[in-house]
């Protein structure tokens, strides 16, 4: 029997959402029970023996992964959402997009000072959203002790951006090219 790698479960869609883009679709990974289990196990592998107080996931596919990772670790899950999607009191950080600006938010009581947090998302591109998530966690007094992604797009420089912030970055696979 041939064993598939996580990368083998990810479908590439040409010209989505715009012409010239190769969209790395992880929903095919999520839909396969074996692939999804492999991904969760591999996301956690570098952190064996470490203790986390919370797992934070970036909207939207980071919620799927982060929830599964938090369950596996028996810890809480913190959603980092687009502006205006969380009820109650929040804090926010804005960050630059290719054409404009975006804002992400987290509940102001989601993370306590000193808590160790693992940040999880499906894909690392430029690192802008992840950097904003890290800043939110740090504003609340949390410590990001790892950043775990299924896919890294190294040509877009996200890993270097996060590593320049002192972050440990773990990705299950990389896709070169845009």
From Swiss-Prot:
Pfam families associated with the record: Pribosyltran
Family: Belongs to the purine/pyrimidine phosphoribosyltransferase family.
MF (Gene Ontology): adenine binding; adenine phosphoribosyltransferase activity; AMP binding
Catalytic activity: AMP + diphosphate = 5-phospho-alpha-D-ribose 1-diphosphate + adenine
PROSITE patterns linked to this entry: PUR_PYR_PR_TRANSFER
Enzyme's top EC category: transferase
Subunit architecture: Homodimer.
The keyword Cytoplasm is annotated on this UniProt entry: yes
E.C. no: 2.4.2.7
Function: Catalyzes a salvage reaction resulting in the formation of AMP, that is energically less costly than de novo synthesis.
Protein name from the UniProt record: Adenine phosphoribosyltransferase
Keywords for this protein: Cytoplasm, Glycosyltransferase, Purine salvage, Transferase
Pathway connected to this protein: Purine metabolism; AMP biosynthesis via salvage pathway; AMP from adenine: step 1/1
Biological-process GO terms, alphabetical: adenine salvage; AMP salvage; purine ribonucleoside salvage
InterPro entries: Ade_phspho_trans, PRibTrfase_dom, PRTase-like, UPRTase/APRTase
Location of this chain's protein in the cell: Cytoplasm
GO CC annotations, alphabetized: cytoplasm
């Amino acid at each position: 029997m041939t064993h598939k790698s996580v990368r083998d479960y990810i479908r590439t869609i040409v010209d989505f959402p715009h012409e010239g883009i190769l969209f790395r679709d992880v929903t095919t990974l999520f839909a396969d029970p074996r692939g999804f289990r492999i991904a969760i196990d591999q996301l956690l592998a570098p952190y064996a023996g470490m203790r986390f107080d919370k797992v934070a996931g970036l909207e939207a596919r980071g919620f799927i992964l982060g929830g599964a990772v938090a369950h596996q670790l028996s810890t809480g899950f913190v959603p980092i959402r687009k502006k205006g999607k969380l009820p109650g009191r929040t804090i926010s950080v804005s960050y630059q997009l290719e054409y404009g600006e975006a804002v992400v938010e987290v509940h102001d009581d989601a993370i306590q000072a000193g808590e160790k947090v693992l940040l999880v998302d499906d894909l690392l591109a430029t690192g802008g959203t992840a950097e904003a998530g890290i800043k939110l966690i740090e504003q609340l007094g949390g410590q990001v002790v790892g950043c775990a992604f299924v896919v890294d797009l190294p040509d877009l420089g996200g890993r270097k951006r996060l590593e320049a912030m002192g972050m440990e970055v773990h990705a299950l696979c990389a896709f070169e090219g845009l």
